[in-house]
Regions:
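Generic preference for hydrophobic
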Residues: 60, 73, 95-96, 202-204
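Membrane-helix interfacial anchor on the cytosolic side
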Residues: 54-60
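Membrane-interfacial terminal anchoring regions of lipid-handling membrane enzymes
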Residues: 1-28, 64, 137, 216-239
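Short acidic-hydrophobic, aromatic-tinged amphipathic segments that line or gate anion-handling sites
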Residues: 60, 117-120, 210
Length: 239
């Protein structure tokens, strides 16, 4: 039954996505707010299909830890779900995305229209400086920047070393960093066709305020993300 539900979800969600990609082309000419509203409508559809076809619900906890103003959200990354679901709780997120995604047909057009941040992970120090400038630009526009500091999707039980980019952003940005733990990979794993029913939980932890020593920041951020991942995985497995 899980296979059939997963197959049906893939067919319907891909059809929904392709249809809206075509219908949204004229919206590219309108103000960015129109494109943002259109993307939120697409994501609402995906999340509704997830609930109905996969019987997979979701919950955000600790949203009171999100500052009203700009901040950096440093989230675990276990699933494709992570790249869309934050729109449910963040009004206008600016995702930091790997450059390879921009090779997907039409993806680059929409990502640039939404003013996302693309990074070349092989670009070295120059690319890191550009990322810091781009993040500063989005924060100055009162947006929340979302980064996956582990760099790529991982299994929910993995303890992934955090990349140095998040430390550089913390030092240079002077805004709170909000850690996020997930258990999405247990239900909707990377490169996995089957998607389990249940409830995905994303937990926003207490923000790390500016002023921490670099080593303390790295240690606390890693502990909050990975300890939270473990607890949420245990919760999913015990349900």
């Amino acid at each position: 039954m899980i296979f059939i539900r997963s197959l049906l979800f893939n067919i319907v969600s891909f059809t929904w996505t392709f249809l809206l990609l075509v219908l949204y082309i004229p919206i590219l000419l309108l103000p960015r707010a129109s494109m943002l509203a259109a993307i939120r409508f697409w994501i609402a559809g995906i999340l509704a299909l997830q609930r109905v076809l996969l019987r997979l619900d979701f919950e955000f906890r600790g949203t009171e830890n999100l500052p009203d103003g700009p901040c950096i959200i440093a989230a675990a990354h276990q699933s494709a779900w992570d790249t869309i679901a934050f729109y449910a709780v963040v009004d206008d997120p600016a995702f930091i995305l790997k450059q390879e995604l921009y090779r997907i047909p039409m993806f680059e057009t929409y990502a640039r229209r939404l003013n996302m941040i693309a990074i070349d992970r092989t670009g070295g120090a120059g690319e890191a400086r550009r990322m810091i400038r781009d993040v500063a630009d989005r924060l100055s526009a009162m947006r929340k920047v979302i980064i996956f500091p582990g760099g790529t999707r991982s299994a929910p039980e993995d303890i992934v070393p955090l990349k140095s980019g998040i430390s550089a952003l913390y030092r240079r940005s002077n805004v709170p960093v909000v850690p996020v733990s997930l258990n999405s990979g247990y239900f909707w794993g990377r490169r996995s066709f089957r998607k389990r029913p249940g409830r995905i939980v994303a937990q926003f932890h207490e923000p790390l305020l500016p002023g921490l020593d670099g080593s303390d920041f790295d240690r606390i951020l890693s502990a909050r993300i990975h300890d939270g991942n473990r607890l949420l995985l245990d919760e999913a497995q015990d349900a």
